[in-house]
Regions:
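N-terminal hydrophobic/helix-forming segments and targeting peptides
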Residues: 1-470
Length: 470
């Protein structure tokens, strides 16, 4: 048999895509780098379950790396590193480039909020000798996934005198936690006959927080509620009225864990979108003197539409770029118009158990690198930014040049559902933008799963974006 390749084989090698670039193509050294990188990521995830804590932890990392607080009246030089915090719930990290923002900035934008259960403004009540919290769920979650689950309380309370109190209760395995109760199967005939979306309503997500009455209560009412409030008062110095000026939420109380016999994956709460936030932050910390100013921005409120003054629809980032442009002697809108952005957000990894929800040829897969999504939205490409072919080509070439493992993918089958990212709000500022992130299994569940290799490739992608010329 001849060893010469046929014309068809040669043509195929020249013009056809090569297929998967999965984990099998990486050597042991690269896999170890991925595993080592994820040690820091797992710590970040455990310390950053809610946006205020994510900002605090990011700020700690940034200061250790030499970042200083941004001063609009200061003069900055290439290589200077600054941070800019928005109301303790969003943060920008900027590394000043050799050309500043004269030719635009490089933006990597991730969000640090995740689906959770928020407390209502007046949450604490007692019913049949049980103390409970009334809640209002946040973001697109499946309510049934949050029942019969150990929960922790996180957040901030501002007292009447203006004192700010940070609360964390339930993370330590030796500390008590909280729970949304569920109905036993023996009495669930009516419950299980309902459509899944109607099994639990928002008003059913009441959180059990106590059952013992306050001692020496005599004939007073609501002694269990009083006892809970007395415990909170003793530990934090707060009174019931302080709930009215508080941001408190309940999140899963379990820690991040490796998944699989091979420990190749990570399970935990809040991968969406901290699995993109952390690699982008680390890229900012590691880049030294880029050509263009590089900005990693961690924003809030993405899960509920990016509204509010800490969400992507606020003008905080726009004004920051304007201030940087002012120092360079150009108009802010011109700097933005020349900027490029990676919208650092996750996508839904193909799950063979639920294959009917995906279109296999245009899905992303675990262990095949970062995923580029040209558009998200729903139906006929509604509510999305659709990245241009030109910008897709530039990002594709950048990743290939820097040997970053990558893939493309859509969010499931057309008309199956859909979702959105902050990309459309960035595009509205006349910035070229495309979504680039990590594939996730069990997205929006209390326990999401990602690949360590994909997390590391996200870091490689963001670093290349900051450090290389496009």
């Amino acid at each position: 048999m001849s060893d010469e390749k046929s014309k068809a084989t040669l043509l195929k090698e020249e013009i056809m895509m090569k297929g998967s670039k999965g984990a099998a193509t990486l050597n042991a050294e690269e896999i170890k780098k991925a595993d080592d990188f994820c040690v820091g990521y797992k710590k970040f995830l455990d310390h950053s379950p809610v946006e205020r804590e994510a900002v605090s932890y990011t700020l700690e990392l940034a200061k250790k790396a030499g970042f200083t607080e941004y001063d609009e009246n200061a003069s900055y030089n290439a290589g200077d590193k600054v941070y800019y915090v928005n109301r303790d719930k969003a943060i920008a990290l900027a590394v000043i480039g050799k050309n500043g923002v004269k030719n635009g900035a490089r933006l990597a934008i991730a969000h640090i909020d995740s689906p959770r259960i928020d407390l209502k403004p007046n949450p604490l009540y007692e019913d049949t000798n049980l103390a409970l919290f009334k809640t209002h769920y946040y973001g697109g979650l499946k309510k049934y996934q949050w029942t019969a689950l150990p929960l922790s309380l996180h957040g901030t309370v501002v007292k009447l005198d203006g004192t700010k109190v940070n609360i964390t209760w339930g993370d330590d395995e030796n500390e008590s936690c909280f729970c949304v109760t569920d109905l036993l199967p023996h009495l669930a005939k009516d419950q299980v006959s309902k459509p899944l979306a109607k099994v639990f309503t928002g008003e059913d997500l009441n959180v059990l927080v106590g059952s013992r009455p306050y001692e020496d209560g005599n004939d007073e009412k609501d002694l269990v509620k009083l006892n809970v409030m007395a415990i909170l008062n003793k530990k934090y110095g707060i009174v019931e009225g302080d709930f009215l000026s508080a941001e408190l939420c309940l999140i899963p109380s379990f820690k991040t864990r490796d998944i699989g016999f091979d420990a190749s994956m990570i399970g935990g709460y809040g991968h969406d979108d901290k699995v993109c936030a952390y690699p982008a932050v680390m890229a900012s910390l590691d880049v030294e003197t880029p050509e263009q100013t590089c900005v990693t921005y961690l924003t809030d409120k993405e899960e509920t539409g990016s509204d509010g003054n800490t969400g992507m629809q606020s003008d905080f980032l726009r004004y920051f770029i304007y201030d940087l442009a002012k120092q360079d002697g150009i108009d802010g809108y011109k700097a933005l118009s020349k900027s490029t952005c990676l919208s650092a957000d996750v996508s839904a990894a193909y799950d063979p158990t639920y294959a009917s929800a995906y279109e296999a040829k245009n899905s992303c897969y675990i262990n095949e690198g970062v995923v580029i999504s040209k558009y998200t939205g729903h139906g006929g490409k509604y509510d999305t930014s659709d990245a241009s072919a030109e910008y897709m080509g530039k990002v594709r070439a950048l990743l290939e040049k820097n040997n970053v493992m990558w893939q493309v993918g859509e969010l499931g089958k057309v008309d199956m559902g859909g979702g959105g990212t902050i990309a459309k709000y960035v595009a509205n500022m006349n910035v070229d933008v495309v979504d680039l992130g990590v594939p996730v299994l069990c997205m929006h569940a209390p326990f999401e799963i990602v690949s360590k290799i994909d997390v590391y490739m996200a870091y490689r992608a963001f670093f290349a974006f900051f450090d290389d010329k496009i």
